[in-house]
Regions:
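Cytosolic nucleotide-utilizing catalytic cores of signal-transduction proteins
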Residues: 1-136
Length: 136
């Protein structure tokens, strides 16, 4: 059933290649697998989760990602390459970026701990999301 959601999939297609589509169809093991194999390893690897999330929210624009994170573009390139090694997906590839985007959303929804994003001088988070002040 999940293969209908990705008509361009190579045939035969492996079940693991359809993880996002399986999640959309309500497959709980696929949901856990995406969180465990993509979100958690990126989160455990320092700045990789933040870099990948920012890159995806910047529409895959390397320079914009570097500006948002206050780092050199080569740092972004290195981190994206490293993220691919850690999770097995190359976010510069459209299909892999889709898989990673779904995995990151699932990780946030699953209650996985979130790291704070750096805040720019204008009060915006580096990813472009508004920062909501919290009371202590």
């Amino acid at each position: 059933m999940a293969v209908r959601a990705w008509p361009e999939a190579p045939r035969p297609v492996l079940a693991d290649d359809l993880l996002p589509e399986r999640v959309l169809a309500g497959d709980t093991p696929a949901r856990r697998r995406l969180v465990d194999t993509v979100h958690r390893p990126l989160e455990a690897s320092g700045a990789l989760l933040e870099t990948v999330a920012t890159y995806l929210s910047c529409g895959g624009a390397l320079e914009a990602t570097a500006r948002a994170l206050f780092v050199h573009p080569n740092t972004v390139r290195y981190r994206l390459r490293r993220a691919g090694e850690v999770c097995g997906y190359d976010v510069t590839d459209p299909r892999d970026a889709y898989v990673v985007r779904v995995a990151l959303a699932l990780g946030r929804l699953s209650g996985a701990p979130r790291r704070a994003l750096p805040v720019r001088a204008d009060g915006e988070a580096a990813s472009g999301a508004a920062v909501v002040p919290t009371q202590l």
